[in-house]
């Protein structure tokens, strides 16, 4: 069936002492939320509607031209995102972790970001502009599927003998995807229509677990999808006016 969402939001924008602030509080009333779960031990997945769910939270953004050459910004959000209904199977058991009060999948409760740009008062190498950028992002813990927050969800037994394995081996994993921090740095110079940028993304080589993938309900492949490792590179751009 069709999913519907009714959004209620109130926001405030203010400017004081050089700061610009945007703050918003919201409540989303979700009807017939579409949820997808693994279909037992086969490779298929099932989708169904959950009668009631909600997300509510607070978002903010603060920016300031701190000096003539330095710009800073801060942003963040706190979100409660939960089921307000319980779905059960024919035996009366809760289906795939879809229970009143359980968290919705893939939604972190907290996210924060800081970014800054510094433009040199006297650009280097006779360039038109020389600048430094830094950005930091924090993402809170999450679940890939609603069922991942059920007790015992991280216990997998394949039941299949293969390559010397009996199939009775137990693999134990924590399916609560942990929070992570990413720091990116870059420096650039501009010569007329040309721009050169040296960047280091994921400076501390954070191994962020973005989601968990299980094949055949965990009887086959078990793997985490991760972020890009530390990456160093150079970008050249030409701006057409």
Where are these regions (language model features)?
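Membrane-embedded beta-barrel scaffold of Gram-negative outer-membrane proteins
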Residues: 1-58, 77, 81-84
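Residue-level signature of outer-membrane beta-barrel architecture
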Residues: 2, 12-14, 64-65, 118-120, ...
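Repeated loop/turn-to-beta-strand initiation elements of outer-membrane beta-barrel proteins
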Residues: 18-21, 69-72, 123-125, 193-198
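Solvent-exposed loop segments that connect transmembrane elements
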Residues: 35-49, 83-102, 143-173, 210-224
């Amino acid at each position: 069936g069709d999913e519907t969402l009714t959004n209620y939001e109130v926001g405030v924008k203010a400017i004081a002492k050089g700061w610009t602030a945007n703050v918003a509080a919201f409540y989303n009333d979700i009807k017939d939320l579409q949820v997808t779960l693994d279909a037992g031990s086969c490779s298929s997945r099932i989708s169904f509607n959950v009668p009631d769910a909600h997300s509510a939270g607070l978002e903010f953004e603060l920016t300031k031209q701190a000096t003539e050459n330095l710009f800073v910004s801060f942003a963040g959000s706190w979100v409660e995102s939960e089921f307000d209904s319980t779905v059960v199977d024919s035996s009366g058991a809760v289906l795939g972790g879809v229970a009143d009060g359980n968290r919705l999948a893939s939604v972190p409760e907290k996210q924060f970001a800081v970014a800054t740009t510094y433009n040199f008062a006297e650009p280097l190498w006779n360039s038109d502009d020389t600048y430094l950028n830094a950005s930091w992002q924090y993402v809170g813990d999450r679940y890939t599927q609603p069922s991942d927050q059920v007790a015992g969800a991280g216990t997998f037994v394949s039941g299949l003998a293969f390559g010397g394995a009996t199939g009775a081996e137990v693999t134990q994993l924590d399916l609560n995807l942990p929070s992570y921090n990413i720091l990116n740095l870059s420096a650039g110079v501009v010569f007329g229509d040309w721009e050169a940028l040296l960047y280091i993304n994921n400076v501390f080589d954070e191994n962020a677990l973005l989601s968990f993938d299980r094949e055949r309900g965990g009887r086959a492949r078990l793997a985490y999808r991760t972020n890009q490792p530390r990456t160093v590179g150079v970008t050249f751009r030409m701006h057409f006016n």
